[in-house]
């Protein structure tokens, strides 16, 4: 959960997730919808899908016991070098360096290493140095300490050097410019996107469709369409509504909202739609949800923001 997600966001989801899926077998037995719903709000939903797939494989291949060898961990769905190393080190105390953004930043400053954060060259250099630092016993404690140090003290901006236990050994601090290490990651240029979304209601239920694209795949959302202008997005949405047996109640939006995902700045226009005829819709990628079902459905933050904007409009 903590990969590319802030601690404060994870804190609200971690314990409910463990309550819902207390062990590997429970996670493996759950449907993808159940797992995505429990993950809702954390973003990067491929992590949740891979976590479930890994649980299924652990149950099928290893009898529900997580393998303790790095080479076996790497074979699990969604487990790259870092995830395999993190589990081996933090869960089993093995002498395996697990280098994520915080550890990379801490050791880059200790050794005054320059490079692009997250780049292969810098990550390999830091991993090599981390391996030499790990003790033969309880290596996971050192790994966790470095992660916490980067999270709480050796922060990207304004590091709290006077309270750092590594201050006397930090080459970047001796230089007087620790904040400049290891360097800056190039930021992608912002991209403006127009999104038109339709809220359709029938007998007290709301129509949601399942996303098929890579971004947010498998999540439920209001019918929507993206384009490079509001009018193009509206026309694209009108075309999408036809096979769903819906049409605009009015060509004017009832609400507007904004949403940002990484470098995508999304301007949202919310329209009301209504069923055409009986609308006895029968398709696996569309479903009428009762209001009480929405709280536990696999719905992304963007969709909840659209619903909130519509509710505020009255």
What are the roles of these predicted feature ranges?
Residues 2-175, 179, 192, 242-247:
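Catalytic cores of DNA base-excision repair glycosylases
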Residues 151-314:
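Intrinsically disordered, low-complexity, charged terminal extensions of DNA damage-control enzymes
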């Amino acid at each position: 959960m903590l990969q590319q997600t802030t601690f404060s966001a994870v804190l609200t989801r971690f314990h409910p997730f463990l309550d819902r899926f207390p062990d590997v077998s429970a996670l493996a037995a759950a449907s993808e919808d159940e797992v995505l719903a429990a993950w809702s709000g954390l973003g990067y939903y491929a992590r949740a899908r891979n976590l479930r797939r890994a649980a299924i494989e652990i149950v099928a291949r290893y009898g529900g016991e997580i393998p303790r060898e790095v080479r076996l961990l790497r074979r699990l769905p969604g487990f790259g070098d870092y995830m395999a190393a993190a589990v081996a080190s933090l869960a089993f105390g093995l002498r395996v360096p697990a280098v994520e953004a915080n550890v990379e930043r801490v050791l880059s400053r200790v050794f005054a290493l320059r490079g692009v954060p997250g780049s292969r060259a810098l990550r390999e250099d830091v991993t090599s140095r981390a391996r030499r630092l790990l003790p033969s016993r309880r290596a996971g404690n050192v790994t966790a300490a470095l992660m916490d140090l980067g999270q709480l003290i050796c922060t990207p901006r304004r590091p709290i050097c006077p309270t750092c236990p590594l201050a006397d050994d930090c080459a970047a601090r001796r230089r007087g410019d620790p904040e400049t290490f290891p360097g800056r990651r190039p930021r992608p240029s912002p991209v403006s996107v127009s999104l038109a979304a339709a809220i359709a209601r029938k007998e007290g239920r709301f129509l949601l469709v399942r996303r098929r694209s890579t971004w947010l795949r498998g999540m439920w959302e209001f019918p929507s369409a993206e384009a490079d202008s509001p009018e193009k997005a509206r026309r694209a949405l009108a075309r999408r509504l036809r096979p769903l047996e819906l049409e605009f109640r009015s060509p004017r939006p009832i609400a507007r909202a904004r949403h940002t995902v990484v470098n995508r700045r999304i301007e949202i226009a919310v329209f009301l739609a209504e069923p055409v005829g009986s609308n006895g819709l029968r398709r696996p990628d569309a479903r009428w949800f009762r209001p009480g079902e929405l709280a536990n459905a696999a719905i992304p933050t963007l969709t909840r923001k659209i619903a909130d904007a519509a509710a505020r409009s009255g």
